[in-house]
């Protein structure tokens, strides 16, 4: 007979149990988000109704557009934040200036930092946000759905023939991604091999010659079809390979919607034939 403690629980029961264990004495009532990605995380975790202000470019979901802006690329409006009396601030460690955040923390305002460098950390952030959410079960369910979607993509494309992939950001100067970014993980998820995965810095500046030397089979950019045309023209005549453009917000924000970019990339990359043999 199986011991009671080892009896397998249905998935729904597990999610409910986790929700009860992480339910705080009092959920956050006045939340401020300082980046578009943390704004999306807040809504996914059931905190959308508690947001009182957000950062510039927080445009998803639609209701986020109606909220006051207290942060932008120019900085954080500490005075206005204090006037709004938040009991929780969601910050982007890699993008928000640290000094004003330290000032706010010194005044006793809880700050939740989000800066995932791995896809699985987005789900972890959702689970962690459950403790502040009036709907913790929503946060845990969003995290579980995210993990399931990631696993589905991994299973579907794990056996794909690897394609050497150049992640391109800009042209003059020309930047790319190392293997230690979310964007590179999305490429790997779809069977791509980031040709600059070995870079020691997350976002290295590279030369045209360095890219050519590594012989990419596909180029990935964020943008629209016009971006595809511009990038293709930029590499002519030396390099003629498929260029895939991904929705900029989906691809560049550390939120659940990054899996929409992953699905977009996986489908397009799978349709690109792999050369039978190449000369080296």
Curated annotation (Swiss-Prot):
Entry binding sites for cyanocob(III)alamin: 57
UniProt domain Fe/B12 periplasmic-binding: residue ranges: 30-277
PROSITE patterns documented for this protein: FE_B12_PBP (PS50983)
GO CC terms in record: periplasmic space
Top-rank taxon: Bacteria
GO terms under biological process: cobalamin transport
Annotated protein name in UniProt: Vitamin B12-binding protein
Species for this entry: Yersinia pseudotuberculosis serotype O:1b (strain IP 31758)
